[in-house]
Amino acid sequence: MILNETVKNINTFVGHIGMLLTHTVGILKFYILVFGRKKIQNIMDMLKDDEYYYDAVDNFCPAQFLNNGKKLSTKLSVLLFMMYSFSGILSHTSSLMVINTEIKGDNFLETNKTCQDFMPFFFKIPFNTDEKWECELAFWFMDISFGIFAWLIACHDGLYVTLLIFLRCQLVILGQVFRSIRRRSLLALNLPKNFSVIYDRDHPEIEAEMYKQLTHYTAHLKVLLKARDKIEDMFSFVTLCQTLACLFIYSSALYNISMTPIGSTEFFVQLEYFICILLELSAICWFGNEITIASELIRLSLYESDWLSTSTRFKKSLILTMTRMQRPIYLTIGKFSRLTLATLVAVFRGSLSYFALFQSIQ
């Protein structure tokens, strides 16, 4: 419907293409929330499995680190809800201010405008809007509909970011646990911190505990790798659609901002919408990048795990794990590109090119 009504005028089309793509991707996100609930719950259970709870050693407390990750995900989720909601509130307020300024009477008879001219976004009004109060009612009708849809999108984005944060936290925790494996083994055997041996094989209890701990940590790593695969399967396609859409959404938003007088209410409406869309992709790219960094540090943690005096079987198992971690963990955008900050920069650069194109044909 938007295409049929706006494609006749290139300026109008460019101005509305961002909203069109936003809601198209939003439908895919709604589909994931509705039909992927069991898979999402399975991923959450894998990332918070109590079997892989670790005690604090030295200056690192895994439980506190994980709680900090929970607090961060909560703050980001609340921020997304507030930003997405405020976009509709600000556009509603702007429309009311404009219509009350330009329309002094109770209807549009003495003007050459209709209610559609004052709508912040293209919207098919399902009832008569000849009167001013009817147009204001249409504002409420549109904003409530957009608000509900914005909350659904915020639910998806908040959930996705939370899963990325938890995966990153677990990888960081696992890296610290690998590094302190000897210290944890000594604690498990109630041995003093400064207890040392030349060869672990001379102390079978230490050798057995070290190998037991390494096997347990490696099993945790396998669980995280499986969780990564499930997250990839669940969100990879919608992330691809989101990334491709952002190429045009960013350029459309920048075009709208450039066409609006600076300081006007409409200017701040478009600016807030642009910030929302930028935050949406930036969050997942940022934590996708953090996951890759955390996984790369695991290999270094394995090397720093005080393995010189360990047994042959311990060293072989350690080498196998290090070999696996030579290939870092990363999420992809539809299997085409890694979910990193470099991708975000590439998308923004591409959108600037489209923005320049839109400017040249206005």
What function would you assign to each model-found segment?
Residues 1-362:
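Membrane-embedded alpha-helical segments and the immediately adjacent membrane-proximal loops
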